[in-house]
Structure formats: C-alpha cells, structure tokens
UniProtKB/Swiss-Prot annotation:
The keyword Nucleus does not apply. Gene3D superfamilies: Transcriptional regulator MraZ domain (3.40.1550.20). GO terms for molecular function: DNA-binding transcription factor activity; transcription cis-regulatory region binding. It comes from Staphylococcus epidermidis (strain ATCC 35984 / DSM 28319 / BCRC 17069 / CCUG 31568 / BM 3577 / RP62A). One of its GO terms (biological process) is negative regulation of DNA-templated transcription initiation. Forms oligomers. One of its GO terms (cellular component) is nucleoid. It holds the Pfam family MraZ. Its main location: cytoplasm. This is Transcriptional regulator MraZ. The lineage of its organism: Bacteria, Bacillati, Bacillota, Bacilli, Bacillales. CDD domains: MraZ_C, MraZ_N.
Amino acid sequence: MFMGEFDHQLDTKGRMIIPSKFRYDLNERFIITRGLDKCLFGYTLEEWQQIEEKMKTLPMTKKDARKFMRMFFSGAVEVELDKQGRINIPQNLRKYANLSKECTVIGVSNRIEIWDRETWNDFYDESEESFEDIAEDLIDFDF
C-alpha cells in the first residue's frame, strides 16, 4: 500500500527520484500513465494487469469508454528504476501533467501519483476545504 507525500525534483533529462518508501513495493519496473486531475498514475505490474482486466469490461460501443481507454493506455509506459532510484518520465507525460522542476509524489493506496508541485498544492488547498463534506457523502464506515 502506498501512502505519504514527498517532494522531489525533475532533472533536465526528465529523471526523478522515486521516494525510497515506494521503491520496494513498486519493484524495479512499473507502469506510469496519464492520470486524472493532470497528474500521472504509477502502478505495480501486478496492479496494472488487474486494471487491464477491468478496462476490458468497458463497452466499446460507448464513445466515452473509447476516449478514456485511448488516453489511458496510449500514455502508458513501463519504467525502470536506475541505481539511484530514478525513473525517466517521457516528454509526452511530462507535458500532460505540466511537470516542472519541482514535483510531488504521493501514495494513494494501490498507486502513486506524480504531480507538478504547484498543481498539487492548488489541488490540495481546494480539496482541504471540502474534505469533511466529501467524507460524509462518500464513506459509509467508521475509522
């Protein structure tokens, strides 16, 4: 399970260190792709296989299903950690997520997310205001 928030930098070659807390669970190779809210999603290879199976159930007769699958899968790339714990994020994904030098990597249960730091901070500030209301609307259990 992935959790936590970590600030890292993207170098001029598009490489970024993956937080050490995430490296063990991700293994040496994992998948990154376009996420929602202008971030990148990162999945273990095992989790990616499960997502692929779920996506196969989407009705291809639905235009939105086709659009979503095209965007999600065409952006997917297998990345490999180098000896310094970095991955190379392809230019098309850096552009999609508007990644600048300053990035934030967060853990979200079964995936990691890679955000431009300013975009993350804006999203966080906006979401923090409605956090309790969202919990009340979505969650039916105590914790």
